[in-house]
């Protein structure tokens, strides 16, 4: 499932997420400190991250707004609709 995420000064604080599957993030605009488990990645336009979504993850610090990134989630086969 693809999602286009945009964060601005009016965005709510992002919680930490955790869900089944794998996730791929591709930064389009801005800068963010993105947490995955105990690691924090400083990400800017052009950067990408692929990770196990079972591990807690999410934006930790919004460094340069607006922030825009593509998030593509691949859920386990049992969750996919036929």
PLM segments and residue spans:
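Short acidic-glycine-tyrosine-enriched beta hairpin
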Residues: 37-53
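Short, conserved beta-strand element in jelly-roll/cupin
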Residues: 6, 17-34, 72
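Conserved short histidine dyad/triad with adjacent acidic residue
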Residues: 1-19, 39, 53-56
């Amino acid at each position: 499932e693809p999602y286009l995420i945009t964060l601005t000064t009016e965005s709510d604080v992002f919680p930490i997420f955790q869900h089944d599957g794998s996730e791929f993030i591709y930064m389009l605009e801005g800068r963010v400190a993105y947490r995955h488990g105990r690691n924090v990645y400083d990400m800017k336009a052009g950067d990408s991250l692929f990770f196990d979504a079972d591990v807690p993850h999410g934006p930790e610090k919004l460094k340069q707004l607006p922030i825009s990134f593509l998030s593509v989630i691949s859920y386990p086969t049992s969750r996919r609709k036929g």
